[in-house]
């Protein structure tokens, strides 16, 4: 056996993810910060990302977190994030809810009812997490995300196929272009998801070409990494319906924690959302995040995002010595064209090996 890892699979309002919590050698990742560990992981273990997220172990919407020992005082657990896209600057997209559900319901960390409070350490920095627990289950997870901020508001952006679209730029754990679905002529419903996906990819490409982003606290974060598309809610009890989409075409079925944080930063900058005011946003499938701004500073906010997660399976993933696809594979029937194109050379190299 070449590789064996233990994992918990879970979904957050329909968004699938995997928490990898055991595997020989995978805790020995060098770095004095989780950001450095993520960088090392990308440079030396990117084959593992491909193995876990591509077929036959993954599918286009798959993502994963790898639990690692924390680096900062006060952190209960650290993790790096594996997404479908591979970039030279760095993914910091948090996936905290499924991490906490996996940690507590698996018994890795002790659960205290009715409330358990933890500090998790993703690459973007420490985040406080509060879990409402009952009967040995995590019922609701609230996360105080990283400081979030808008850097541009309603800038006219020429998007091929969609004309001039007002776009804002905001950080919520990733840098996003934030746009209104009505300006794109799309509707956030499952049967039109492909249209939303293609429009969001076009927005991200246009924003990368024309709009600048620089994170004031990390010079390695200097590119717009995705698109948040916002629409009116279907349920009048909510304030918005939204999704976040990456350049690879990976799109959230949940409202997206990082995307919601960026959207809240835009609303705050416009004067449309105040500290302490509730903000409820729904995803493609109707799942709701309950949010509010818990504090503000010089141009930034700390958003609190509340949502639910469910465990869907417990797994031991293996790679046998003679597996002809040691990094997995993709095909053009269900995978985005860009992903298939970048994977072709990798597959050829695997076969040569």
Please identify what each model-predicted range represents.
Residues 1-168, 180-353:
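A glycine-rich beta-to-alpha transition motif near the start of alpha/beta enzyme domains, typified by
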Residues 173:
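Glycine-rich ThDP/TPP pyrophosphate-binding loop and its adjacent helix/strand module
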